[in-house]
Amino acid sequence: MGVGLSTLEQKLTEIISAPVEALGYELVGIEFIRGRQSTLRIYIDSDDGITVDACADVSHQVSAVLDVEDPITVAYNLEVSSPGLDRPMFTAEHYTRYLGEEVTLVLRMAMQNRRKWQGIIKAVDGEMITVTVDGKDEVFALSNIQKANLVPHF
């Protein structure tokens, strides 16, 4: 389960994971963005990468399950995609997998009067992540991380 997810996102993750995994894909994570046009974004991956057809298959299966379960009370768009180069990070396992990589964090509550941080993932200890920012180690509670993405390098 993703750290820092809302109750709705936790419920959606539980509902969505089975059909995604049944199709042979990894559910990387989800985002539910509320607004005038709400969006449920599902990130999937596999060892062979993700094709447009894979996204369409997952979208079809997940739509059917969500129509039955009906956990979302507002109109929304469903998007299914690969994590991309700026891969979002949702779980402690994601941070562990990408130790030594550069990450951008947006915090729920500011630390040292900052909500945005960028640095190198140094360590993961349970619910805490250590990121080296400008040569100094900073420790963040995973539950305080609103959004995290790898920084692609070309």
Curated annotation (Swiss-Prot):
Listed InterPro entries: Ribosome_maturation_RimP, RimP_C, RimP_C_sf, RimP_N, RimP_N_sf
CDD domains reported in the protein's UniProt record: YlxS_C
Biological process annotations from GO: ribosomal small subunit assembly; translation
Alphabetized UniProt keyword annotations: Cytoplasm, Ribosome biogenesis
Pfam family, one: DUF150_C
Location of the protein in the cell: Cytoplasm
NCBIfam families reported for this sequence: PRK00092.1-1
Function (record text): Required for maturation of 30S ribosomal subunits.
Protein name: Ribosome maturation factor RimP
Organism expressing this protein natively: Yersinia pseudotuberculosis serotype O:1b (strain IP 31758)
Gene name linked to the record: rimP
